[in-house]
Amino acid sequence: MLFFVGLGLYDERDISVKGLEIVRCADAVYAEFYTSRLMGTSIERLEQLYGREIRMLSRSEIEGEPEWLEHARDRNVALLVGGDPMISTTHLDLRLRAIEMGIDTRVIHGSNIASAVPGITGLQNYRFGRSATVPFPHIVRGKRIVSSTPYNAVKDNLRRDLHTLLYLDIQDERFMCINEAAALLIEVANGSGDEDFASNLAVGIARAGSEDMCVRAGTLLELKTYSFGPPLHVMVIPGRLHFMEAKALRMLAGAPEELLSGYEL
């Protein structure tokens, strides 16, 4: 059987008791951290707490034809991933391939940023629209390309009074920060003639699940220069606010009263 074990948000202690029991009893334990990272720990600390040797898998060993998957035909194999396993389409694809191979699968869910953000900010979870990722700019034929997809997702959600959760890009050991994401969104907006976009309310969250988590609300322009500290970072662009959401942003994220006054439903 193949067990997908979610490790939670930040460090080795975020695993569930059920997940820990499965890891300790499995015949083999693997991990992949290219889809999501636990920034507050290391593979050595995971091995120490869990009492198991853990083999790290590369992207090709997950998305290609993984030889290790064959072991799950007649043994219990645990795959450790950050957050919740099935948030990533990569893991869903792997699970479906395993089922097609006749391998039984089981998912041990973990806390993830999508479910944590409403609790961190006080924004109601049912009022979030489509999420998006803010990617790093890339170069095509010598031209710098900035994706307009996250900006378009935000605008579409705002038209429907919905909040937008923005994931920030990860490339190897390079982590996008809130400041850069805010700057990229403003750049795309200005290029579209939407110069008022920088005045939108935004919420930055750094190191969710850690003891030194940073949560700050302000205009997008203000977040562009605010120091959030080390990664991982995510950002929320809220739509119109229920009065309880507005109160929560004041108390939990330091949102200025004058900024919130135009956002309440």
UniProtKB/Swiss-Prot annotation:
Q: Name one GO biological process term.
A: methylation
Q: Does the keyword Transmembrane apply?
A: no
Looking up InterPro entries in the UniProt record yields: 4pyrrol_Mease, 4pyrrol_Methylase_sf, 4pyrrole_Mease_sub1, 4pyrrole_Mease_sub2, Dphthn_synthase
* Catalytic reaction equation(s): 2-[(3S)-amino-3-carboxypropyl]-L-histidyl-[translation elongation factor 2] + 3 S-adenosyl-L-methionine = diphthine-[translation elongation factor 2] + 3 S-adenosyl-L-homocysteine + 3 H(+)
List the keywords (alphabetical): Methyltransferase, S-adenosyl-L-methionine, Transferase
Broad class of enzyme this protein falls into: transferase
Binding of S-adenosyl-L-methionine occurs at: L9, D84, I87, N112, I113, L168, A208, H233
Hey, which pathway is this one from? Answer: Protein modification; peptidyl-diphthamide biosynthesis
Q: What is its EC number?
A: 2.1.1.98
One Gene Ontology term of the molecular function aspect: diphthine synthase activity
Q: Which domain of life is it from?
A: Archaea
Q: Which protein family is named in the record?
A: Belongs to the diphthine synthase family.
Free-text function comment from the UniProt entry: S-adenosyl-L-methionine-dependent methyltransferase that catalyzes the trimethylation of the amino group of the modified target histidine residue in translation elongation factor 2 (EF-2), to form an intermediate called diphthine. The three successive methylation reactions represent the second step of diphthamide biosynthesis.
Give the quaternary structure: Homodimer.
| Official protein name in the record | Diphthine synthase
Which organism was this protein described from?
A: Methanothrix thermoacetophila (strain DSM 6194 / JCM 14653 / NBRC 101360 / PT) (Methanosaeta thermophila)
